[in-house]
């Protein structure tokens, strides 16, 4: 039992899962597919690994990745996203309360109602529980955008232009422009992990695009 939670920088957890898969299963190839927070995490992992990434990891596809955590946090704090922010904070509060039962006296939710956005939450919980100086320090160190140039396997990033959760900093045009491995696509629609298309088989455009990229 540990106080830590899943967050945008827990690449050690991802590494543990990957190594377990490599050592215990007979996969010919492993593909990293990430959505939203998991997309940022996948990019952060691959960028940190660079040329040292396990040889079985052949490709990666991510959708709606908040590559710039500060920019995404500021976007979510806007009034237009109030309903989303409230739902996120309610869900996080439930996780805090569950941890309080598991580890009484080590964490509390006193005055939790004063937390209004991710900056408040990250300053109070994420940063101190995971060794960061502040929310700003956490965002800076765990944003994947500056690690993208170090990715050495074919990787597709798809961030819709109408995604309500991500801002300009989350469209890594500059970081991908000179890369021979990372490709950025910015479709006009798709929202945040939406990419719905009205087909009889009920398939998502994102599913079809991912398969297309992996087969290319």
Where are these regions (language model features)?
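Alpha/beta-hydrolase active-site loop
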Residues: 4-25, 44
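Active-site nucleophile elbow and catalytic-triad environment of alpha/beta-hydrolase enzymes
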Residues: 124-147
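Short beta-strand/loop motif that positions the catalytic acidic residue
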Residues: 151, 157-159, 163
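Catalytic histidine neighborhood in serine/cysteine hydrolases
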Residues: 177-193
């Amino acid at each position: 039992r540990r106080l830590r939670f899943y967050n945008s920088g827990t690449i050690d957890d991802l590494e543990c899962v990957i190594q377990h898969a490599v050592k215990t299963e007979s996969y010919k190839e492993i593909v990293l597919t990430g959505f939203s927070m998991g997309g940022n995490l996948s990019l952060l992992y691959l960028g940190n690994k660079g040329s040292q990434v396990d040889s079985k990891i052949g490709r990666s596809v991510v959708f709606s990745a908040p590559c710039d955590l500060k920019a995404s946090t500021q976007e979510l704090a806007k009034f237009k996203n109030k309903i989303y922010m409230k739902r996120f904070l309610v869900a996080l509060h439930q996780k805090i309360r569950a941890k309080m039962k598991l580890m009484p006296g080590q964490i509390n939710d006193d005055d939790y109602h004063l937390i209004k956005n991710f900056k408040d939450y990250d300053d109070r919980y994420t940063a101190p529980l995971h060794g960061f100086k502040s929310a700003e320090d956490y965002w800076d160190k765990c944003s994947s955008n500056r690690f993208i140039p170090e990715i050495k396997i074919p990787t597709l990033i798809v961030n819709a232009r109408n995604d309500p959760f991500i801002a300009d900093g989350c469209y890594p045009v500059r970081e991908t422009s000179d890369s021979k491995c990372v490709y950025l696509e910015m479709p006009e629609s798709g929202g945040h992990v939406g990419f719905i298309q009205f087909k009889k088989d009920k398939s998502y455009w994102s599913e079809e695009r991912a398969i297309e990229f992996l087969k290319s």
